[in-house]
């Protein structure tokens, strides 16, 4: 096999090792996640109280295990984030948690095919001084028939995760050499069902660019 021109970190995270959290373990994770939610800066926005937490498959990267979470609030916002920890001889320790909120939810976006959340957890240094954002991605498919989800960078698969209770978690490099992650949903027979970018283009920005181009053309 000849050398590749896409020298980038791939499949660096361990696949999920556990079932989705439940019982006392879920209670422990919930405590850390809710504490992170309390620390969110809302700029005086009333986001409400968190409801039931949906946990996502665990993934382990560079010695830390990440368990993402999502919860809807009483005001219709969505809390999203993760709890991470190290595995010591006595069990999980060194817990950390992050959380944020959004008003952009799947219920209000019928054109979405995948409901995605993401957070950068590390940096990978590549060739010629370039670096990639090691990104935790989690979500749910909004179309039926899926079995596995992949993360692709410039059409190169860099991670994958089988659906677990219709949920998935990925850890993959993003924003490397002007290439950006695309998340794809695949069926059991290997057929592509859906694809979504982590980046949503703003229609207003597109209109502004088009307007500027029109002005330049007139000049």
Mark where each language-model region is:
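Short amphipathic beta-strand and strand-loop transition segments with alternating hydrophobic
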Residues: 48-60, 123-128
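Extracellular beta-sheet/turn segments enriched in Thr/Pro/Gly and aliphatic residues
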Residues: 200-219
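Generic recognition of long tandem-repeat/solenoid scaffolds
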Residues: 67-69, 94-99, 137, 170, ...
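Ser/Thr-rich low-complexity repeats and stalk/linker segments
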Residues: 130-136, 140-205
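A general sequence property marking short-to-moderate contiguous segments
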Residues: 30-37, 41-43, 62-127
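N-terminal low-complexity, intrinsically disordered tails enriched in Ser/Pro/Gly
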Residues: 1-52
């Amino acid at each position: 096999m000849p050398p590749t021109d896409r020298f980038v970190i791939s499949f660096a995270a361990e696949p999920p090792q556990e079932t989705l959290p439940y019982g006392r373990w879920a209670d422990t994770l919930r405590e850390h996640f809710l504490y992170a939610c309390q620390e969110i800066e809302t700029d005086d926005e009333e986001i409400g109280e968190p409801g039931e937490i949906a946990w996502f498959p665990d993934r382990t990267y560079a010695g830390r295990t990440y368990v993402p979470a999502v919860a809807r609030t009483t005001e219709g916002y969505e809390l999203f984030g993760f709890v991470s920890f190290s595995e010591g001889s006595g069990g999980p320790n060194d817990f950390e948690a992050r959380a944020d909120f959004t008003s952009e939810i799947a219920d209000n976006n019928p054109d979405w095919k995948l409901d995605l959340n993401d957070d950068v957890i590390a940096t990978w240094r590549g060739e010629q001084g370039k670096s990639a954002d090691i990104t935790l991605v989690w979500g749910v498919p909004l179309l039926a028939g899926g079995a596995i989800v992949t993360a692709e960078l410039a059409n190169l698969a860099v991670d994958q995760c089988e659906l677990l209770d219709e949920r998935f978690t990925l850890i993959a490099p993003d924003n490397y050499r002007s290439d950006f992650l695309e998340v794809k949903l695949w069926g059991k027979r290997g057929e592509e069902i859906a694809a979504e970018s982590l980046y949503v283009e703003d229609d207003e920005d597109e209109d502004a660019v088009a307007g500027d181009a029109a002005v330049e053309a007139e000049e």
